[in-house]
């Protein structure tokens, strides 16, 4: 068709769509303070300045006991390993290979924390490998088991790879720092609000 629409499965190597580098502006977040931008989707009122001055509620001991747990509800979320501006049918968005999925990213984060004196447990269980449905229930069980085994853990990080775009275009969220591109990072934090209960704020 003249529209260029893909009407049949593409061969590996045939472009299905484009990849666009984009800085997702934090100025649409609604609230900001310094370099912190907040999109508040709850009915709660948040004062970022006040929150930054409030006690955290725990203190890192920098001991040999694990204080951070890194895990992945969707461990098979994967990355492309090369820079290009298109994607094909051969470019998987999920992989059980720890060389290209979130377990690889989690280990890199763990290495940085360990290098700074913070003991880390990195649980590489692939909760979504067999089925996407139920992965949060399975990862919750993993977190509970680790907290029971390592009561010294103070912080749990569930690292994901975001997915922004459409079937025809994938957005690569980046910000240039100096002369290098860096991936943008978003923290998702829940709280008790509306139908969400038993969730400490």
What are these regions (language model features)?
Residues 1-156, 161-201:
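Catalytic-site microenvironment of enzymes
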